Amino acid sequence: MKGIKTMVKKMMKIAGTLFIVLLVVGIGILVYLCYQNLHWWEKDMKQIEKLGVVERQVTLPNGNVINYGELGGDAPALLLIHGQMASWEDYSSVMPELNENWHIYAIDVYGHGESTHEDEVYYLDINGDDIIWFIENVIQQETVVSGHSNGALTAA
């Protein structure tokens, strides 16, 4: 009987130690993931800085402001329009490849980033008209337009 109690005590000690080790490792992983989640944009910003993307703003005649990132030299124009809950910076992961063949303009649609935040402009027709103005007055050349999610609806 004494041998069983000793064995049970040893097993409990091992189980307790294992539990504490797993708890510490789990907390460490949780802290790491929380940090990554709170600093997710830093990777995008480093990529944007490395590429030399220039952030600009243009004020339209109607007073609306379009914020955008521009990258590239003498190449055909490509306009990137993001979807909901995003910004032009979200294209940073594909910009290196796109920059090989395109002069990139990635805009913040209204209500996002540094573009106008007014309820009256959150309509596809207004966005569409203002993007046409942007192409005609800022890009000033034939432009391929690509949109993601809601940005694709705007592009259409």
Listing of model-derived features with the role each one plays in the protein:
Residues V109-S146:
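Active-site loop/oxyanion-hole signature of alpha/beta-hydrolase fold enzymes
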Residues L71-E114:
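Conserved HGGG/HGGXW glycine-rich cap/lid loop of the alpha/beta-hydrolase fold
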Residues N64, M85-S87, A152:
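Short beta->alpha connector loops
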Residues G3-P76:
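Alpha/beta-hydrolase fold catalytic core
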Residues G147-G151, A155:
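Gly/Ala-rich beta-loop-alpha elbow adjacent to hydrolase catalytic centers
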